[in-house]
Amino acid sequence: MIDAKLVKELRDRTGAGMMDCKKALEEANGDMEQAIEILRKKGIAKAAKKASRETGDGIIAAYVHFNKRIGVLVELNCETDFVARTEDFQELGNKIAMHIAAMSPRWVRREDVPQEVIEKEKEIYRDQLKDSGKPEHVIEKIVEGKLNKFFEENCLYEQKFAFDEDKTVEELIKESIAKIGENIRVSRFVKYTVGE
């Protein structure tokens, strides 16, 4: 088990996301320098440094399923119109739109989930465990784990990428940031399904 202080320190040093830092530290058996190297090799540290840059350009990527019953629009932003016109960027938009069609996320990031939804989920999880006889601190750990699973299932950035489950959508985007050299982000999306 990796200490949360180590994860925070790695995040402060690289700007990478918490889950990326935790995975890198686990892979490096807690070695900070090796974890930084792992993040650099994956392009995540580089991507994190670009994350604060403004993304005022981009595209609306569209995907319509072959049966014409599911359609997705996704706003994918970057820093310049030059990048927005590249084949790599447009392909990324198409991949993300197809992923949304397949996996039906509800929000882009966990920060986008309304607090009342989070509280309701926690309440449901606590109710499921109230008669378990487990101590309160154990129940809270279980609730936290279930909540993380909820985010992984419902937040686009935390979902396993539908076409390569070895990475999340966020990791796919960070790889593109490292390759393209500009900050990239999904601003919003909408999925339409006939009859819903």
Swiss-Prot record:
Q: Which Pfam families match?
A: EF_TS
Q: Which SUPFAM superfamilies match?
A: Elongation factor Ts (EF-Ts), dimerisation domain, UBA-like
A GO term, aspect molecular function: translation elongation factor activity
Q: Which UniProt keywords apply?
A: Cytoplasm, Elongation factor, Protein biosynthesis
Q: What is its main location?
A: cytoplasm
Q: Where in the cell is it found?
A: Cytoplasm
The record lists the membrane-crossing segments as: none
Family statement: Belongs to the EF-Ts family.
Fetch the HAMAP family from UniProt: EF_Ts (MF_00050)
The name this protein goes by in its record: Elongation factor Ts
Origin species, per record, is: Thermosipho africanus (strain TCF52B)
